[in-house]
């Protein structure tokens, strides 16, 4: 299983509740947030999320996630993966999901396009390969590039919960997302902050993919996720914001910014 599949729960994890995002959205145009992904004592990867309007397509937002390996993972299983989600904001639903993966030398380019008018998914497994079609259920879909932003935009209250449909390749999945707390919380050796605690896990038929995700994001206009924990078959991962939140939110264990390796690469795209 790719690290990116459970990470989609960060990014997050039949829409039973038709979620309407508040306006304006929490992120500014061009926002970039970078996270350090730790596997026990190992710096395993860094993940950078960006958001900006899609040119010449009114109402469509381009969400991108760039995942790059770090530390010993870089030595034996280098990762350069970019996930792109073209998401319609009103109503919220994915319109195109693009995966450019380079993981341990395995290079893949995949595209998934849901056609809501006929409840059909179109999956393109690789350039030059035949298109594969599959049925989708009624209602909007998320993808692993858009979920983190929908979690940020949703009007959470303590105890509220939603079930979202998630599209991955040609497999419709389900994720149940709930709000555990809205309070001043002390997490990750930080002073108490006003935070929203979110819990996500596979739901229904998707429960065959075991795991869960907890996200803590600021309870303010920015709704910035600052810390998360991810549990899946390979263990538990800690995910810390290291760039984009400002000095008061970025994780700086020695008082200095943690270097972002992808910024020093001449060609970050896979």
Specify the residue positions occupied by each region the protein language model found.
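Bacterial N-terminal signal peptides
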Residues: 5-15
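Hydrophobic alpha-helical segments and their boundary regions
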Residues: 6-8, 30, 144, 212
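Intrinsically disordered, low-complexity regions
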Residues: 13, 39, 131-134
